[in-house]
């Protein structure tokens, strides 16, 4: 029986309160409206960004909410005006929209879109659809969306400009990682930092994003990749993916940036911060060489005050830039999927656990405890 145009009842993990476990509930998912697509989620992964809104220290989050944004699925139905998707298409929802019409979409300099850049904080400002209503209801109460995706539901509704259509034979249980973590780190290295062959690099933070940045540096031909994390258990994985050296700041007798400068005769060519926080941001800057050192910032910490920097550090030739989703968009993500299929990079190494969707709280605990890189949730 067709579900097109009808409300779908399904299971979703709802965050009712900050600091509390998610609750598996039956939700009602409304049909897609104009330029919207309803997607059946097949597989998703847990990203640290999913935990920000339910962190008691984060005061701006809107609850109740269905979290999740790193996923892949199949189109169930489309709303009026949707011409580039049809039921049965395999897709990856993206938190970065791409309208193809605005000045950002038409520029080769960014993957931003007016629909994205108008948000001061996209983590909390894509909580409703364009008509300022939600497509989710539970127990008669409207439930907020998250990053325009809400992957922790068996069905979700997203805007068509937030969807990438991918190959029919794509393995959704792996390419779901391309929805955020892998693309963010890998692209930060090859698209935004533009790591060059023979260069030296430092990567701070060895979660899914940081390890993907290591893969990106290796793919770009870096001769030395220094991986930094306070969890030494991640070093074996980092070296397997291309890191030449690993440093734990807690095991050093001087600041890690000073050690890196000594190791590289003056500092690395490229440094990528995938951890966030003022201390790590400062170390990222300080570990790069004067003259041409490149600093790329990817990581975000809840309520962190950010970086304070002297103009002299910039006058000496360093460049600083931010990176969002690694420079990819809905038009370039399909090529990433093809590259994975053709063996250009390995997503398997990032997957440490696979769990049924109902065990989502276990997946979140593994992430918080530093025991997982990426846990795949199977719906």
From Swiss-Prot:
SMART domains noted in UniProt: PKS_ER (SM00829)
UniProt keyword annotations, A-Z: Cytoplasm, Metal-binding, NAD, Oxidoreductase, Zinc
Record's catalysed reaction(s): a primary alcohol + NAD(+) = an aldehyde + NADH + H(+); a secondary alcohol + NAD(+) = a ketone + NADH + H(+)
UniProt binding sites for NAD(+): 205-210, 229, 234, 298-300, 374
> Which GO terms are recorded in the biological process aspect for this UniProt protein?
formaldehyde catabolic process
Per its UniProt record, the required cofactor names are: Zn(2+)
Give any GO molecular function from the UniProt entry: alcohol dehydrogenase (NAD+) activity
Note on how the cofactor is bound: Binds 2 Zn(2+) ions per subunit.
Amino acids binding Zn(2+) 1: 47, 69, 176
The answer to whether UniProt assigns keyword Acyltransferase to this entry is: no
Q: What is the protein name for this chain?
A: Alcohol dehydrogenase class-2 isozyme 2
Question: From which organism does this entry originate?
Answer: Oryctolagus cuniculus (Rabbit)
Q: What is the lineage of its organism?
A: Eukaryota, Metazoa, Chordata, Craniata, Vertebrata
């Amino acid at each position: 029986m067709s579900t097109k145009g009808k409300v779908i009842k399904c299971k979703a993990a709802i965050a009712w309160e900050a600091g509390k476990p998610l609750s598996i509930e039956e939700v009602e998912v409304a049909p897609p409206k104009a330029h919207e697509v309803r997607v059946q989620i097949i597989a998703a992964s847990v990203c640290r960004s999913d935990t920000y809104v339910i962190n008691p220290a984060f005061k701006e989050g809107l609850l109740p909410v269905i979290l999740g944004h790193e996923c892949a699925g199949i189109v169930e139905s489309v709303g009026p005006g949707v011409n580039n998707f049809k039921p049965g298409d395999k897709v990856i929802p993206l938190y970065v929209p791409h309208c193809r019409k605005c000045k950002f979409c038409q520029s080769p300099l960014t993957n931003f879109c007016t629909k994205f850049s108008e948000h001061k904080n996209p983590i909390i400002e894509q909580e409703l659809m364009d008509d300022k209503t939600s497509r989710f209801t539970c127990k008669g109460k409207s439930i907020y969306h998250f990053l325009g995706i809400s992957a922790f539901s068996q069905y979700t509704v997203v805007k068509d400009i937030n969807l990438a259509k991918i190959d029919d034979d794509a393995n959704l249980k792996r390419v779901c990682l391309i929805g955020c973590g892998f693309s963010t780190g890998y692209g930060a290295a090859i698209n935004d930092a533009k790591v060059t062959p023979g260069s030296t690099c430092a990567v701070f933070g060895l979660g899914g994003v940081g390890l993907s940045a290591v893969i990106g540096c290796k793919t770009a031909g870096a001769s030395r990749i220094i991986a930094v994390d306070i969890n030494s258990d991640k070093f074996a994985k980092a070296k397997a993916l291309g890191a030449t050296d690993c440093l734990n700041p807690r095991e050093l007798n001087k600041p890690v940036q000073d050690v890196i400068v000594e190791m590289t005769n003056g500092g690395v060519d490229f440094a990528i911060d995938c951890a966030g926080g003022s201390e790590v941001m400062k170390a990222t800057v300080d570990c790069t060489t004067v003259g041409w050192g490149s600093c790329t910032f990817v990581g975000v910490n809840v309520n962190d005050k950010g970086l304070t920097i002297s103009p002299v550090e910039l006058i000496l030739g360093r460049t600083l830039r931010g990176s969002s989703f690694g420079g990819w968009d809905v038009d370039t993500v399909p090529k990433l999927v093809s590259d994975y299929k053709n063996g250009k990079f390995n997503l398997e190494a990032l997957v440490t656990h696979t769990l049924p969707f109902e065990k989502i709280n276990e997946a979140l605990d593994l992430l918080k405890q530093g025991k997982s890189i990426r846990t795949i949730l199977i719906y």
